[in-house]
Amino acid sequence: MSDDAKVQAAVKRATLHAQRAMNKLDAETLKELQQLYQQAAADLGQRIAAAGGGDGNVALTQLQDVLAQINDRLRALSAARDALLNNGLENAARFGTLPLTTAGTGVQSKALLSSAAAMRVSEESLRFVHAFVAADGLQLSDRIWRLDRHARDTVTNAIEMAVIQGHGAVQAARELLMRGQSVPGELADKMNAASSAGISKAVSGALTGSGSPMDNAMRLMRTEINRAHGEAYIAGVLDHPHAAGVRFLLSPAHPEPDICDLHATANLYGLGPGVYPDRETCPWPAHPNTLSYVEVVFKDEITDADRAGKETPLEALARLTPEQRKGVLGVKKAEAFEKK
């Protein structure tokens, strides 16, 4: 095996190691993020419980003080989340360049990145992540601001609604009892919802339930950490003198057909299925909340069959299964495609 072949094989092995490290980083980061939000929800519940009166209810007169305490805790949550995100981004970018270094491959070669060059690529990828403007016009800082606003609004609204409705329900119940009438079940439910226990439950659901700020934070965390890794890796491997491009890989956890199936199989440049010659043509990442990767393809890996198999996007679509086309195009467009 030639020296070049040994280096290329080492880069391939190191790429797999980096992907495994990224899988671990993703799992550990999301677990820690979930714990941050769950602990915050528990702390909020304790503060609400402390504000409950002798009857266990939070009085209307205490509402503003409770909200001030809640907002303080949410700000602390935001700071902890941002620190976790920044740490994840830095590690992901480092994992991205590691397969292109002597430290990552265990071999010496002028074709690999120096430590200084690897650090520069990592830093550039981090700047890219922060400056990147998505199709919806938002940058990372905008998404973080939206996360904070969502948490503040959902938690505040849950508390305000419970306290205000509970206050009115208590007054109405007193009037009914004074007239010797029974309290309707609906009114009793509103009174119970205004108890410190009821409010704590509502707050926990608002902060950590389905579609909650925690869910959105986990989505953001995975998306941006994966982006930092991929951008660093692509920039690093395309600097290798023998790189032909990068291959778009389907995630092992790919749940159902979508646009990724097309990107991973189309041979648009005669380099082989899913191989793209540069960053501009590579469609990775195909969508948010994905844990997916690309891998380097070297020039000597390109076969005559790859070159002869160059195809158009329409030809690539035609090769997909009907189910895959539905995932890529949507049901109606896929049906229209079938009729052509």
Predicted regions: what is each one?
Residues 201-308:
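Acidic, glycine-rich two-metal-ion catalytic cores of nucleic acid-processing enzymes
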Residues 1-203, 298-340:
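N-terminal leader/targeting and assembly helices and adjacent pre-domain segments
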